[in-house]
Design a protein with these regions (language model features):
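Carbohydrate transferase catalytic cores enriched for Leloir-type hexosyltransferases
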Residues: 1-455
Length: 455
């Protein structure tokens, strides 16, 4: 009997991370159906070359261990920022010797401040992890659905062994942006993603994308890399994401500064995303500055954690004359505070250069909040005539929409967002499993192709 083994390793290890892929994985697993027809659906993780069935995705009710785990996650974020600092300094070194000294200093400090404590924390966490899962024996005909961000080379040999044992490999593709737009990412992430994508193109039997746009981009990329003959032996499909904020709690309090922002009558346009170059906050500020110069009183609220390559933008925001007057930024909002922002904002604005889906658009529009977005294919797929679109080559295009919206009180889209409908996470999880099962049961199996760096 075919089983869908839906992999969620990273989210299982880091259940409190609440952005991007992690939000998708957590919600799909929570709503995973027990079976689709005759196909059983099981959430699984890969630990040290063994599959485990997840019995509890959320952390245990152990305050001390949970506090240690939370501290470990903060320490990992600090370690990443320290690495980013090193990456910024390295190109400025005047000689190879200076660069080498900087690298050695970075490694020594990193090992002392982060390496040793993180190893100890991971050892403590391992005991908790094993209380939330049970060993699972794979079977020929099983299908391993790589839902999580499995961009780790230590996972490759295990997946290939499963494939040699008759397990099919299904890759969930969120986007190809590190390949198509590498300028938006750190060099190391591009290298990691590229290595993973090279591996997955040789290993996967089929692909599930998170939008029809990404599915089509993926098929074209594989045709370019491995040729039409090989690509035609694979299957490609997609599912759409849900929109509920699952970590919202009625008992949690709203960020006081955010509450104060929405207590006055002037309109607030909201942007929700990680702060990084691809999201195009610079364009957003340019557009709002033009609108403000024209007398517009609409305010801009930027909500999102601090990402990468954003020092200049953060400096611009922190030194902006409109900061805390008509410009506001929040970097650590809870789901409860985010729900409050969606409920009280006048519109969402999303000027991203490129996306695989655009989850904030769905979260906003599902709550009746109209959205303005970049005129890109995937946003047209999601919003259709219910969104307003602007030209990324001209900030005045967005400024004009903002001014017209405030002056007329009518949102500048062809159709009313009240008539727009979207699926929830239960339907999203059903789409993923049903379409995967359908494609797996009709597709021929493909031979294994070992990863080049396997021992």
């Amino acid at each position: 009997m075919t089983r869908l083994l839906v992999e969620c390793t990273h989210v299982f290890k880091h259940p409190t991370i609440n952005s991007g892929i992690q939000r998708v994985v957590r919600n799909v697993i929570k709503q995973l159906p027990e079976r689709v027809g005759d196909v059983e659906c099981l959430p699984v993780i890969s630990l040290r070359g063994q599959l485990y069935r997840v019995t509890r995705l959320a952390p245990l009710d152990a305050p001390l261990l949970n506090a240690v785990a939370a501290f470990g996650e903060r320490l990992e974020r600090l370690a990443h920022r320290f690495w980013q600092w090193h990456q910024r300094l390295d190109p400025r070194c005047p000689s190879k010797l200076t660069r080498r000294v900087l690298y050695v200093a970075y490694r020594l400090i990193s090992f002392g401040l982060f390496g040793c404590p993180l190893r100890l924390i991971r050892l403590m966490n391992r005991k908790q992890l094993l209380k939330r899962c049970t060993p699972l024996q794979h079977q020929p005909g099983d299908q391993l659905v790589l839902l999580d961000s499995s961009w780790h080379s230590d996972f490759f040999p295990h997946a290939e062994q499963l494939k040699r044992d008759g397990v099919g490999i299904v890759a969930v593709i969120y986007d190809l942006i590190p390949l198509t737009h590498p300028q938006f990412y750190d060099t190391r992430l591009v290298q990691v993603f590229s290595a993973w994508f090279d591996w997955i193109t040789r290993t996967a039997d089929g692909y599930m994308a998170i939008s029809a746009t990404v599915r089509d981009q993926l098929r074209a990329e594989l045709q370019r890399r491995v040729g039409p003959a090989h690509t035609d032996r694979l299957w490609f499909d997609y599912f759409h994401l849900g929109s509920e904020l699952d970590l919202h709690s009625a008992r949690a309090t709203v960020e006081p500064r955010l509450q104060q922002l929405f207590s006055t009558p002037e309109p607030v346009l909201l942007m929700v995303s990680t702060i990084e170059p691809r999201k195009n906050h610079t364009y957003l500020l340019d557009a709002f500055e033009r609108a403000w110069a024209a007398g517009c009183t609409a305010r801009l609220c930027i909500a999102g954690r601090i990402g990468w390559k954003c020092d200049a933008l953060l400096a611009r925001v922190h030194n902006h004359p409109e900061l805390n007057r008509r410009l506001f930024m929040f970097n650590e909002l809870s789901d409860t505070s985010l729900e409050h922002a969606y409920a009280h904002a006048s519109a969402l604005v999303f000027p991203s250069f490129v996306e695989g889906f655009g989850l904030p658009l769905v979260e906003a529009m599902q709550r009746g909040l109209p959205a303005m977005g970049s005129d890109i294919a995937v946003f047209r797929e999601i919003g259709g005539e219910f969104m307003a679109y602007f030209d990324l080559q001209d900030p005045q295009s967005l400024a004009d929409l903002i001014i017209r919206f405030q002056q007329s009180g009518q949102f500048p889209a062809a159709r009313n967002v009240a008539d727009w409908r979207w699926i929830g996470w239960r339907e999203a999880s059903a789409q993923l499993t049903e379409r995967t099962a359908h494609n797996v049961l009709k597709a021929p199996s493909a031979p294994a192709r070992p990863y080049a760096h396997c021992p």
